[in-house]
Structure formats: C-alpha cells, structure tokens
C-alpha cells in the first residue's frame, strides 16, 4: 500500500515539473531562428542536467545558482527572450531531475506514478491556485513514511548503485530517524513562515533578496531559532505597518534560515550519509514550490 502511495506522490510531483512547459508560450510571435535556438537550449539543458554529482560533497549552491539566475532574468524585458528561456529551462529541468532521481531510488509502482503524473498535468492545465501546497505535501510524504525502510532495503541499494555508484567501500552510514525528524520540523517551520508572508505581507514577492540571502556564507554566524524569531518579528511588523521594508527583512532572515539549515545538514552528515544529498534536494525542491507558486 505504501508503495502505491509513494509512487502516486512522485508521479504527482513529476507531472508538476514537466520541463519547459512554462516557456513554450513565449514562442508565440517569435522568429524561426529564436524558436530553433529555444529548442537547442532545451536539448542542451536536458543533457547537462544528468551530469555526475558527488552526494558525499553536496553543496547547496550548485542547485541554487541555476534557479537563482532564472528568477533574476525573469524580471528583464522581452528583449532578452533567449536568455530568459535558457535559464527557465535549466531551472525546470533541474527540478525534474531531482524528482526523477527520487523515483529511481524509491521502489515505485509504475501505474500509480503514471496516474499521479496525469492528475498533476490536469491540475496544472486547470490553473488551480491552491493545489501547489498539496504537491509540496506529497513531495515530503515518501521521506517521512519510508526513510528507514528504504535505507535498509536491498532494492534501495541496488537502485542507487545502478543510478550512481556513491557507496563507500566500508558501507553506508545511516542517519538516525530522530535527526531526520528534527531537520524536517525545522524546515516545515521556515516553510510555514513563507506561506504566512505570502498571505499577509504587502509585498508578495521578494525572491531576489531571498535567494541572495540563501547564498549565505560563514560571515553570518547565527542560530536557526534566532533567525526564526527575527522572521516572526518582521512578519508582525510588516502586517501592522504594511511597509515593504519589513517584507524585505522578512525574506532576508528566512533566506538565512534556509541556508543555515542546509549548511547544518551538509556539515553534520554530508560526508557520511548516503541519503543526505536527496534529503537536501527534497528540502530545496519543496521550498521552490512554496516560494515560486
């Protein structure tokens, strides 16, 4: 039963990040040359997506930089059409690659994942605003329900070996399930704050500042609970005063919070746990759904 639920969840997420869909409407009224270049960029991005990745030395910046640049160029005028499309393709294909990797690792039920993909595409075409939250929940569900089982299962190990040989000679290190729950609760706290900010703050979109904050370095020596507290104070101040300055501060502290969480996971178990890379990809991919949609 869990196998079917997990497969359906992955199919739902996969259908939501079909590559290039949001860009093809830009091809209307474009020259033939621009359309050819667009398809060429799409094909090149698809090939570059599946490059070799070392999960034992995971760096969130490698995933952040593509989508950060895509957000930045989205604000440019239509004269930079090809640049915009290229970054959009890279960002969407990267998200799709993350989900496809999860589907390779998990023991998926093909028919359930197929129907999940179809339903997600129908919802996307119907332009239902609130179903994005449902997609985010489904993305988190398999990791919560089957983490320990998957790490211990032989099929999980075989899928990982077939996809990329990332096992160390002395065998894998298993992260304690309580550590996963702690990280998950911290991530959900930050994500709930993002939703509250999107609902109640006067400035609904501050992705530029948010992702500049996510490119957080060791210059900021702060605890996660301090960043959460500062974010809550900025959220309350922004709701009361309705001033955009507090919205910018809110996004800044949230960005630092996400970055601190990623850095903490990577530093603590990044070189030992075979599942850390996918856990970080899960968190980051979920944050993208919440922030962008």
From Swiss-Prot:
Q: Does the keyword NADP apply?
A: no
Please give the InterPro entries that the UniProt record associates with this protein.
Herpes_U26
User: Would the keyword Transmembrane be found if you checked this record's keyword annotation?
Assistant: yes
Name a single GO cellular component.
membrane
Bilayer topology term: Multi-pass membrane protein
Q: Where in the cell is it found?
A: Membrane
The alphabetized UniProt keywords are: Membrane, Transmembrane, Transmembrane helix
Q: Which residues cross the membrane?
A: 4-24, 30-50, 71-91, 103-123, 133-153, 180-200, 220-240, 245-265, 273-293
Name where it mostly resides. membrane
Q: What is this protein called?
A: Protein U26
Query: Where does this protein come from, organism-wise?
Result: Human herpesvirus 7 (strain JI)
Q: Which gene encodes it?
A: U26
């Amino acid at each position: 039963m869990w196998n079917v639920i997990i497969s359906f969840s992955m199919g739902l997420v996969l259908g939501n990040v079909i590559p290039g869909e949001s860009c093809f409407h830009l091809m209307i009224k474009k020259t033939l040359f621009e359309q050819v270049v667009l398809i060429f960029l799409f094909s090149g991005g698809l090939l570059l997506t599946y490059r070799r990745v070392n999960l034992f030395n995971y760096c969130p910046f490698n995933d952040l930089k593509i989508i950060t640049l895509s957000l930045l160029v989205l604000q440019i005028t239509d004269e930079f059409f090809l640049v915009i499309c290229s970054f959009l393709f890279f960002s969407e294909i990267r998200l799709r690659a993350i989900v496809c990797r999860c589907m390779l690792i998990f023991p998926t039920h093909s028919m359930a994942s197929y129907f999940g993909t179809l339903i997600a595409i129908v919802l996307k075409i119907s332009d239902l605003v609130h179903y994005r939250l449902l997609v985010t929940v489904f993305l988190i569900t398999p990791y919560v329900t089957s983490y320990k089982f998957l790490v211990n299962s032989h099929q999980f190990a075989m899928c990982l070996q077939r996809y990329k040989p990332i096992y160390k000679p002395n065998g894998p290190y298993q992260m304690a399930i309580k550590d996963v729950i702690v990280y998950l609760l911290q991530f959900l706290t930050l994500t709930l704050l993002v939703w509250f900010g999107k609902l109640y703050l006067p400035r609904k979109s501050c992705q530029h500042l948010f992702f500049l904050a996510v490119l957080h370095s060791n210059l900021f020596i702060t605890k996660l609970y301090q960043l959460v507290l500062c974010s809550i104070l900025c959220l309350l101040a922004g709701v009361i005063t309705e001033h955009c300055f507090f919205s910018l501060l809110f996004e800044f502290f949230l960005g630092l919070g996400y970055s601190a969480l990623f850095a903490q996971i990577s530093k603590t178990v990044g070189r030992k746990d075979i599942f850390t890379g996918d856990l970080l990809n899960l968190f980051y991919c979920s944050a993208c759904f919440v922030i962008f949609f």
